[in-house]
Amino acid sequence: MSETQVTWLTQDAFDRLKSELDELVGNRPVIAAKINEAREEGDLKENGGYHAAREEQGHLESRIRQLQELLRTAKVGDVPTEAGVAKPGSVLTVRYDDEDETEKFLLATREEGAHGDLEVYSPSSPLGQALLDAKEGETREYELPNGGTMKVTLVKAEPFTG
């Protein structure tokens, strides 16, 4: 059994996701009514309205479960203030395999970074896991999807300021 992944969220992101969840839960009766109306039209095999409503219900329930799990495992708090160390909620500048170019991204969940201009990488991704708790100047190695490995150096870690 795998251990539960804790997700760091600001209070604003938590509130935004909670509002979305409340709205989706409130829409359940509307979708159920659509399904019942379509069901009353007769033959379900060729009932496009029924199938569309069932598909909509499936998407709704999937998102509800996703949000419930995310909020259940959320660690709500302020942006990490510790500069120089890679933590969820930090903006990281990294260099891959001694290349000259650097990349800058937010180490957070997609939900947390949904309103920013930065690329967002999850702390549970291979890159995110490799960089967690790394100090500036430290080089780590992580596994690529194709099975190869890549070295990445943390150039800078700073608190996310929005």
Swiss-Prot record:
GO terms for molecular function: DNA binding; RNA polymerase binding. Disulfide bonds: none annotated. One of its GO terms (biological process) is DNA-templated transcription elongation. Keywords: Coiled coil, DNA-binding, Transcription, Transcription regulation. Residues 50-75 form a coiled coil. The keyword DNA-binding applies. It comes from the Bacteria. Gene3D superfamilies: Transcription elongation factor, GreA/GreB, C-terminal domain, Transcription elongation factor, GreA/GreB, N-terminal domain. Belongs to the GreA/GreB family. Necessary for efficient RNA polymerase transcription elongation past template-encoded arresting sites. The arresting sites in DNA have the property of trapping a certain fraction of elongating RNA polymerases that pass through, resulting in locked ternary complexes. Cleavage of the nascent transcript by cleavage factors such as GreA or GreB allows the resumption of elongation from the new 3'terminus. GreA releases sequences of 2 to 3 nucleotides. This is Transcription elongation factor GreA. It comes from Saccharopolyspora erythraea (strain ATCC 11635 / DSM 40517 / JCM 4748 / NBRC 13426 / NCIMB 8594 / NRRL 2338). The gene is greA.
